[in-house]
Amino acid sequence: MDLDSMDCTSTMDVTDDEEIHQDRHSYASVSKHHHTNNNTTNVNAAASGLLPTTTSVHELLECPVCTNSMYPPIHQCHNGHTLCSTCKARVHNRCPTCRQELGDIRCLALEKVAESLELPCKHMSLGCPEIFPYYSKLKHETVCNFRPYSCPYAGSECSVTGDIPFLVAHLRDDHKVDMHSGCTFNHRYVKSNPREVENATWMLTVFHCFGQYFCLHFEAFQLGMAPVYMAFLRFMGDETEARNYNYSLEVGGYGRKLIWEGTPRSVRDSHRKVRDSHDGLIIQRNMALFFSGGDRKELKLRVTGRIWKEQQQSGEGGGACIPNLS
């Protein structure tokens, strides 16, 4: 269910197309190297040190079915063809190369070879300089600061990943998200029938401020038996960078107001995770209707806010924004 209308004004109140076009570049994911299944009895050659490069050994450790790196237990057929434990279950105990029965033979030699390897992070092309022992690399890659970001759009199961400039352009071009420049904002959310609340009626706006991008979320959902409205901000970057910023949200009317102040969450945290943690401005429906005039016929919420940067310890100019919440 969509909100009937949404108006937004910001400090500069201009679309940030030029800034985005300057930042945008094609985000190329690292494609996996496919090869024919030569990882047969060459395992013995690897174990005896006859293979010339680490790359050759790394190719032996690539599962011929899913092309992912193999981790113990590594299985092999009677002819020496190897595959990972996940794919063993998928191929119904038949070797995908020679079609012979797999059995329960482990390739201990290849597992031992893997222990001696040190390999770069798979996000090396994105800037990660780290090198890890083979069995430690996978754990690092799940939390690597250089790993791609997921699309922060909450209205669909979007599987797009990329760096921040790529995702900003993706949100604008593919999801038609509103883009604004400035560190203060003024939103008006209008809904004709406030009694109808489904999981989840929501809006998303992207702001460009201090050279960074922020996602402002506003949505209605059921919290227990009661419908609520929630607004929160996410920083398009890592958590350590997000801590450099603060934001405030204010909603009110008829002599009453609610104010929320906090640190934006990183888009590394999913939209649902932030929402379910209640880390934002939460407005109960009765209060929302009071702010709207109390006639309970139409929801009219005006949410204002600002983003500011903590002053630098080194004395550098923080460039704090002047609030404009009138």
UniProtKB/Swiss-Prot annotation:
Catalytic activity: S-ubiquitinyl-[E2 ubiquitin-conjugating enzyme]-L-cysteine + [acceptor protein]-L-lysine = [E2 ubiquitin-conjugating enzyme]-L-cysteine + N(6)-ubiquitinyl-[acceptor protein]-L-lysine
Chain segments carrying region SBD: 113-306
GO cellular component terms listed in the entry, alphabetical order: autophagosome; endomembrane system; multivesicular body
Annotated positions binding Zn(2+) 1: C121, C128, H140, C144
Zinc finger annotations (SIAH-type) as residue ranges: 116-176
Keyword Metal-binding: yes
Annotated spans, Disordered: 1-44
Enzyme class at the top of the EC tree: transferase
Induction or repression: Induced by drought stress, salt stress, osmotic shock and abscisic acid (ABA).
Chain residues that bind Zn(2+) 2: C151, C158, H170, H175
Compartments, record wording: Endosome, Multivesicular body; Cytoplasmic vesicle, Autophagosome
Pfam family name, one: Sina_RING
Pathway where it operates: Protein modification; protein ubiquitination
Domain of life: Eukaryota
EC number: 2.3.2.27
Zinc fingers, RING-type class: 63-99
Gene Ontology MF terms in the entry: transferase activity; zinc ion binding
BP terms from Gene Ontology: protein ubiquitination; ubiquitin-dependent protein catabolic process
Disulfide bridge map: none
Record keywords, A-Z: Cytoplasmic vesicle, Endosome, Metal-binding, Transferase, Ubl conjugation pathway, Zinc, Zinc-finger
Functional note: E3 ubiquitin-protein ligase that mediates ubiquitination and subsequent proteasomal degradation of target proteins. E3 ubiquitin ligases accept ubiquitin from an E2 ubiquitin-conjugating enzyme in the form of a thioester and then directly transfers the ubiquitin to targeted substrates. It probably triggers the ubiquitin-mediated degradation of different substrates. Modulates directly the ubiquitination and proteasomal-dependent degradation of FREE1, a component of the ESCRT-I complex.
Similarity field: Belongs to the SINA (Seven in absentia) family.
Subunit details: Interacts with SINAT6. Interacts with WAV3. Interacts with FREE1. Interacts with ELC/VPS23A.
Entry remark concerning the domains of this protein: The RING-type zinc finger domain is essential for ubiquitin ligase activity. The SBD domain (substrate-binding domain) mediates the homodimerization and the interaction with substrate proteins. It is related to the TRAF family.
UniProt-recorded name of the protein: E3 ubiquitin-protein ligase SINAT3
Organism per entry: Arabidopsis thaliana (Mouse-ear cress)
